[in-house]
């Protein structure tokens, strides 16, 4: 799961959040990102980062797969999940 460091808006991993809630987890491993970084890009370009944050803070959800969050690494764009580490924890630690 990827989360903006300023607003704590979930950028990637919404389905994981819903699954975690459904099984009663109180904690969810996440990577905290500086969404204002120029290295992070939202597509399509018709939706801005500000649109994403504003919609989330107002409780408005975009339909699934409306946006993709990409990160520029060494001149190439990759889905943000590329930098999310594998997390292997005993699920009991998250309750």
Locate each region found by the language model.
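Amphipathic, charge-rich alpha-helical segments that serve as recognition/docking helices
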Residues: 35-76
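Glycine-rich, aromatic-bearing surface loops/beta-hairpins
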Residues: 82-95
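A short, basic-hydrophobic beta/loop patch
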Residues: 1-9, 14-46
